[in-house]
């Protein structure tokens, strides 16, 4: 056989002629001799001492690194080489038994070539065809086996370097077994006989302390090599076979830093480990259930591009389901109704019966395209939790970046009295009943797309203190988000959602009685709800509860025009059974297209947005000032410099905008209970539009320069009622200027104006 086929440790004791120096030649072992012929015709063999493999770059040792302890060394002359050949010792790489005997430390002549059928004694050794050496007593077979044992090679020298890390070190552990050692400190050979160091098992103890950075070199002799390329069948207990590593307990045979085995670190399982096919046709129910049963406190990992068809599964313990991305061409799909098997797929596809948390990541559970029943009692829910009847809190499921869609029941049911669940970045579409149904407390639902319920709600919540934020709820048969609190106090937060094109209400909240409301509905956007019958249902419908917080919502339609033919709510906000809001309505509402009927169905609420500010009947307007002369309210026109109206606790002043208001009405302390004019008081005086009343008396201008009065009823014409007589100066003639009803008197006569500019007089007698 070729000695190159022996282990590298064997090859170090052989000499192989690798020809002359030439650029590009590759040196792979220490025992290769490369010859160089000088100018005098002397040929010398050189051996490479540097790193292996080495590619020669030059035509002589001097041009390829030179002669040194880390490059080339002169090893043999051509004369010695020829002498070895004359003694039948070739350097071609063929086996030479005396050389192998020396390498293994065997007695000369004790080594022979293995040949089946020969008989071995205790003093004989055998070289097998793979370069290994064996000993034993018995007949040689076709390959080594009991009772023969392998002899291991003792390599001559191993070099081990150590750099001192800290000042004062005296002990260095050698990670090899050895029988002799030479020690150099910074290139100086140390003498153990003089006490410079001593050997304690595999540790070298120096008599003098070492300094940081000292380079310690150890040359170890007769180091046993443990790599064995062939093992007897009787020795298998000492080794790990490929079959040991590939069986189900193989990971137990591989260590793991800082302790334990690889098996301890493996927290993932896959359906394929339990026989799942994932072709969308094969029934993978048993494989998936077995995988779930095994995965307590582990993660069950589902592959992309595979569809695992299954009947109903039970999850009895905490674990994690992990896919490789929502809607990434891989899913768990229901077995579905199969008429030929008389099988109707009902119940819950993945039912969580554990009281602990089950988590889902990046997983698709998809029933779209699968035949299911939409008859009550035969429906199939996608993922659901068993109801909690224990009377104590139990954790709900957690789901992140998942898609559960297409089921004839609910896509997801959180379980009765299951609490603290989380749904985030998920999609729930196309269910028969409500897409998501929650009957526990303290759930957090955020950034989810939820819609297209064929018969019910997008999100149905039946318990208190839940939070839905930044979700889309769209195209559902009934309301987008439905909350009903059957008993007790009601608490819910609905913030930042988009509620779009639902058949009935956008958001519907129903409390059990007229209690203080714990409802927060803010920063939501409503589009085109009441699609079942436009103008019939409402964007926000609130039943019972005092002080609902409804703020900063946006109410829109697809077509932003008056009389839009896209669906619109009846009222933006509808209050039933005494429900009230906590403060002003400040939602963005446009009267042209946000609603069909009005912004709100009651006039008791206060309203303030871009269109108007309205104080409802349920609230009085109070403005407090510091004194009776402080102005509380001002009214003015943008283009004018002065107020038109000023109101303070004592008066109301009016002006025309060109100067400070100076006249109006007032209450003076000197005249308590009397309203007085400021700089005069007057009316236009027209009988039909501005009659002045004092009690039941009416006073107006007759239009003929007369002032008229009537008692108990409004005048029917300008000349209705009686003329009020007014005393004037005594006329000088019977045709002096005068108005009907005017009169005058002197010591002799009483004068009466009976017609315009017509006077009559009568003599006055002494009293």
UniProtKB/Swiss-Prot annotation:
Give the disulfide map: none
Q: Cite a single GO BP annotation.
A: adhesion receptor-mediated virion attachment to host cell
GO MF, one term, reads: lyase activity
Q: Which GO terms describe its cellular component?
A: virus tail
Specify where it is mainly localized. virion
Its localization reads:
Virion
Alphabetized, the UniProt keywords read: Degradation of host capsule during virus entry, Degradation of host cell envelope components during virus entry, Host-virus interaction, Lyase, Viral attachment to host adhesion receptor, Viral attachment to host cell, Viral tail protein, Virion, Virus entry into host cell
What's the family? Answer: In the C-terminal section; belongs to the K30/K69-specific depolymerase family.
Tell me, in a sentence or two, what this protein's role is: Functions as a receptor binding protein (RBP) and probably mediates the attachment to the host capsular exopolysaccharides. Displays a depolymerase activity that specifically degrades the K30/K69-type polysaccharides of Klebsiella pneumoniae capsule.
Know the name of this protein?
Depolymerase, capsule K30/K69-specific
């Amino acid at each position: 056989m070729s000695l190159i086929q022996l282990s590298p440790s064997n090859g170090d004791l052989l000499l192989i002629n690798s020809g002359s120096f030439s650029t590009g030649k590759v040196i792979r072992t220490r025992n290769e001799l490369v010859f160089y012929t000088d100018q005098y015709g002397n040929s010398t063999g050189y051996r490479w001492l540097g790193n292996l493999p080495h590619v020669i770059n030059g035509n002589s040792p001097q041009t390829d690194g030179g002669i040194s302890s880390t490059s080339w060394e002169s090893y043999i002359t051509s004369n010695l080489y020829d002498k070895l050949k004359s003694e039948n010792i070739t350097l071609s790489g063929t086996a030479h038994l005396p050389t192998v005997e020396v390498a293994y430390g065997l007695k000369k002549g004790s080594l022979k070539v293995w040949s089946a059928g020969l008989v071995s004694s205790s003093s004989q050794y055998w070289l097998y065809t793979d370069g290994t050496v064996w000993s034993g007593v018995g007949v040689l077979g076709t390959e080594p086996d009991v009772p023969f044992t392998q002899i291991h090679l003792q390599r001559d020298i191993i070099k081990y370097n150590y750099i001192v890390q800290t000042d004062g070190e005296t002990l260095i552990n050698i990670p090899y077994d050895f029988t002799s050692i030479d020690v150099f400190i910074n290139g100086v050979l140390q003498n153990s006989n003089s006490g410079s160091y001593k050997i304690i098992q595999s540790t070298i103890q120096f008599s003098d302390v070492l300094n940081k950075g000292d380079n310690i070199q150890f040359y170890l002799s007769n180091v046993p090599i443990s790599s064995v390329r062939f093992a007897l069948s009787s020795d298998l207990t000492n080794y790990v076979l490929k079959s040991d590593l590939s069986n189900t307990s193989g990971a137990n045979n591989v260590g793991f830093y800082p302790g334990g085995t690889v098996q301890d670190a493996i927290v993932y399982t896959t359906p394929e480990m339990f026989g799942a096919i994932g072709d969308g046709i094969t029934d993978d129910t048993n494989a998936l259930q077995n995988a779930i049963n095994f995965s307590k406190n582990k993660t069950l990992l589902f592959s992309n591009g595979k569809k695992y068809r299954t009947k109903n599964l039970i999850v009895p313990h905490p674990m994690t389901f992990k896919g490789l991305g929502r809607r990434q061409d891989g899913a768990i799909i229901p077995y579905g109704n199969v008429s030929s098997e008389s099988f109707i797929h009902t119940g819950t596809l993945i039912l969580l019966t554990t009281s602990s948390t089950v988590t889902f990541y990046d997983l698709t559970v998809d029933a779209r395209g699968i035949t299911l029943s939409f008859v009550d009692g035969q429906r199939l829910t996608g993922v659901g939790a068993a109801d909690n009847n224990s009377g104590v809190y139990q954790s709900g499921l957690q789901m992140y970046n998942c898609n559960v869609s297409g089921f004839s029941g609910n896509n997801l049911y959180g379980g009765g009295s299951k609490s603290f669940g989380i749904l985030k970045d998920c999609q729930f579409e196309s269910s028969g009943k409500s897409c998501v149904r929650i009957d526990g407390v303290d759930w957090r639902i955020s950034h989810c797309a939820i819609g297209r319920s064929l018969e019910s709600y997008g999100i149905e919540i039946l318990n208190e203190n839940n939070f839905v934020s930044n979700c889309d709820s769209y195209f559902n048969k009934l309301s987008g988000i439905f909350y009903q609190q059957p008993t007790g106090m009601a608490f819910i937060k609905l913030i930042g959602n988009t509620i779009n094109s639902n058949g009935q209400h956008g958001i519907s909240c129903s409390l059990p009685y007229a209690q203080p409301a714990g409802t927060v509905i803010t920063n939501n956007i409503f589009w085109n709800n009441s699609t079942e019958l436009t103008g019939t249902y409402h964007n926000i419908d609130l039943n019972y509860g005092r002080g609902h917080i409804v703020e900063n919502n946006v109410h829109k339609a697809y077509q932003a025009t008056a009389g839009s033919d896209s669906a619109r709510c009846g009222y933006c906000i509808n209050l039933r059974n005494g429900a009230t809001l906590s403060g002003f309505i400040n939602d963005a509402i446009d009267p042209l297209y946000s609603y069909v009927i009005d912004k709100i169905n009651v006039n008791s609420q206060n309203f303030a947005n871009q269109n108007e500010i309205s104080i409802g009947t349920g609230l009085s307007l109070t403005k407090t000032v510091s004194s009776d002369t402080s102005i509380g309210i001002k009214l003015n026109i943008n283009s004018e410099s002065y107020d038109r109206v000023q109101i303070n606790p004592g008066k109301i002043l009016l002006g025309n905008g060109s100067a400070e208001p100076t006249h109006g009405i007032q209450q003076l302390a000197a005249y308590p209970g009397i309203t007085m004019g400021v700089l005069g008081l007057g009316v236009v005086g027209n009988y039909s539009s501005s009659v002045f009343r004092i009690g039941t008396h009416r006073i107006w201008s007759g239009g003929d320069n007369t002032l008229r009065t009537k008692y108990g009823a409004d005048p029917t014409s300008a000349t209705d009622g009686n003329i009020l007589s007014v005393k004037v100066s005594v006329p000088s003639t019977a045709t002096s200027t005068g108005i009907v009803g005017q009169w005058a008197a002197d010591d002799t006569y009483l004068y009466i104006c009976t017609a315009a500019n017509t006077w009559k007089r009568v003599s006055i007698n002494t009293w």
